[in-house]
């Protein structure tokens, strides 16, 4: 019985590790004014699973933290593109 309890605990702990938030940086080169980041940030925050989005005009970068079980990088780049600001994953 103890073995079963330990194995169950291990499995549950492993599942939590898989659901860890993921952070990516997107390049958004078409931002051309200081108000553009607000539009990009708002679009990213509407994506399911996004917990944080920080967009900077000076660097033209968006740093996004999201749950990769609920969303994808493709969904993030589509959101910025649909808002008028195409983006790509910064490698």
From Swiss-Prot:
It is found in: Periplasm. Keywords: Mercuric resistance, Mercury, Metal-binding, Periplasm, Plasmid, Signal. SUPFAM superfamilies: HMA, heavy metal-associated domain. One of its GO terms (cellular component) is periplasmic space. Hg(2+) binds at residues 33, 36. It comes from the Bacteria. Involved in mercury resistance. Acts as a mercury scavenger that specifically binds to a mercuric ion in the periplasm and probably passes it to the cytoplasmic mercuric reductase MerA via the mercuric transport protein MerT. Monomer. This is Mercuric transport protein periplasmic component. It comes from Shewanella putrefaciens. The gene is merP.
